[in-house]
């Protein structure tokens, strides 16, 4: 059904107020809300607002809005739908309370990342029509303006994401928050995080790889499975209850991380409100083939690669390089590759996000990763 647009835009504004990632109320997004909820749910969420609530409080609100008779007849199914769609998720401060979810990252991928059905497939396809606009608007004037904005933010704002090495065992203290949207940590750090939440771990389908398959793109060229996003903490419990996620033991989660590591993943941590000064709730294992962030960047979508990097590669001995170009295949931003004509390695420091895959995938110890904290904005490429 088509929802009242004014109400939907108000809810979008409320959800956007809880995150650094603002999703504009464009037509595909409005249509996703039409597909995902009815007006009764919309009205209820508008009344819930942006504060955290206990389940008891949420029940009382429903009774005030619709009456005791309606509550007795309909509350159970009404709550089941809200819970399963992840419109409300466990609060950050108190996991026994519930908080309005953000849009993306948020309830869109949380609601569609279980076993595929028609509704989930339709929402994914509709969201990708929104995401594709980032490519359609990549024309010279807009590309220039967005790059100028990105360079200004590089000097004045905190980055949207953080990247750590994707290999190695040196731990970065997990109690030191980073003021950015997402973190990408070393495999060693990820193991430490998994251990901290070892009783609340699960894995769900990756929305990016799911879309590639249903749109006819086939399997991930890096051999990564559809099940690729690891959930941690109270949200993991909710997603298991919903049938979205599959529960994992600590050992199973570590084995997945090890496998993803070898295949070239960047371990990206998502947090409440896409802000790393808040608790982590999800580890997305990104690749260059399927990932909305990196694959889209390489194909010429308006760049969303604005990260805080903590490492960069340093040359040990370039004469060891055999020209295999594995570094180029696994580099997320094209910052390094082997130039066959010049017969040398190319490296663009300004585009390097410090993921470490150029070192991980190299069998000849040509480079090593060294500490180097800096913001990075990868300028938009021309459309492929």
Stretches with model-predicted labels:
Residues 35, 67-70, 98-100, 270-282, ...:
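Ferredoxin-like iron-sulfur electron-transfer modules
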Residues 68-84:
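Short amphipathic alpha-helical interaction segments
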Residues 80-95, 336-337, 367-368:
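A short, conserved structural fragment
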Residues 139-310:
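Catalytic cores of enzyme domains
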């Amino acid at each position: 059904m088509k929802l009242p647009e004014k109400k939907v835009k108000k809810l979008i504004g409320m959800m956007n107020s809880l995150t650094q990632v603002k999703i504009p109320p464009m037509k595909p997004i409005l249509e996703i809300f039409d597909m995902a909820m009815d007006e009764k749910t919309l009205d209820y969420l508008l009344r819930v607002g942006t504060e955290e609530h206990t389940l008891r409080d949420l029940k009382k609100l429903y009774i005030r809005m619709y009456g005791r008779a309606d509550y007795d007849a309909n509350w159970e199914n009404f709550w089941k739908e809200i819970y399963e769609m992840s419109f409300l998720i466990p609060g950050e401060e108190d996991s026994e309370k519930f908080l309005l979810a953000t849009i993306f990252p948020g309830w869109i991928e949380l609601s569609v990342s279980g076993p595929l059905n028609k509704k989930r497939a339709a929402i994914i396809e509709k969201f990708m029509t929104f995401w594709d606009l980032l490519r359609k608007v990549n024309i010279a004037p807009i590309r220039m303006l967005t790059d100028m904005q990105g360079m200004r933010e590089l000097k004045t704002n905190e980055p949207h994401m953080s990247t750590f090495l994707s290999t190695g065992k040196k731990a970065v203290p997990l109690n030191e928050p980073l003021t950015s949207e997402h973190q990408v940590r070393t495999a060693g750090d990820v193991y430490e995080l998994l251990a901290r939440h070892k009783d609340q771990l699960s894995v769900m389908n990756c929305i990016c790889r799911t879309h590639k398959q249903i749109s006819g793109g086939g399997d991930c060229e890096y051999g990564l499975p559809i099940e690729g996003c690891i959930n941690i903490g109270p949200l993991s419990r909710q997603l298991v209850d919903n049938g979205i996620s599959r529960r994992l033991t600590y050992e199973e989660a570590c084995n997945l991380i090890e496998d993803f590591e070898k295949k070239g993943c960047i371990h990206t941590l998502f947090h409440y409100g896409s802000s790393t000064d808040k608790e982590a709730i999800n580890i997305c294992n990104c690749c260059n083939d399927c990932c909305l962030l990196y694959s889209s960047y390489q194909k010429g979508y308006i760049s969303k690669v604005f990260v805080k990097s903590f490492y960069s590669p340093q040359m040990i001995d370039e004469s060891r390089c055999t020209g295999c170009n594995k570094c180029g295949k696994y580099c997320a931003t094209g910052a390094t590759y082997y130039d066959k004509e010049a017969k040398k390695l190319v490296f663009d420091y300004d585009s390097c996000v410090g993921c470490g895959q150029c070192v991980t995938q190299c069998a000849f110890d040509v480079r090593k990763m060294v500490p180097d904290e800096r913001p990075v904005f990868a300028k938009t490429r021309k459309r492929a």
